[in-house]
Amino acid sequence: MLLAASDQSVVSTIRDVVQRWGGNFWIRDQVNWKHEILKWKRDRGTVAHLTMYGQNLPNVIDQLDTDRLMVVVGAEKVPPDLFRLADYNVAITNQPHSEIAALSIFLDRVQKGQELAADFSGRMRIVGNVNEKVGVKRSEPIE
């Protein structure tokens, strides 16, 4: 995760979640977003910008190169340069919606639901249960 702003609470929260629950996820803050996008594209990466002003996801999803995909989600007024730099401006819907909702739906569609069966290597693991919350440490047996 590249964060243009400086927000130590977000950085520490993300790092804590990865440590406890696992996954291949990292975060850097105070980055120059334009520099990072240009660098990504120079390295032959694809940039998908999630925006309600873009092309609808079903119309572009098969064109996305998901091997080297940078997903950009604007958290504030998005500069016009971002629309021009992105290889794809993608809309989950052309109606107002939250950024996290757009990212969640986009990632689910790109991964074709396979992320739902992923098992991460963190210290903790969730065990699905109908009646209660069950979280166990990896060293404990799972029943």
Predicted feature descriptions by range:
Residues 1-7:
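Short internal beta-strands
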Residues 113-143:
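Internal, active-site/partner-interface "lid" segment
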Residues 56-58, 79-82, 98-100, 127-128, ...:
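Short, well-ordered, mixed-charge alpha-helical segments that flank or form enzyme active sites
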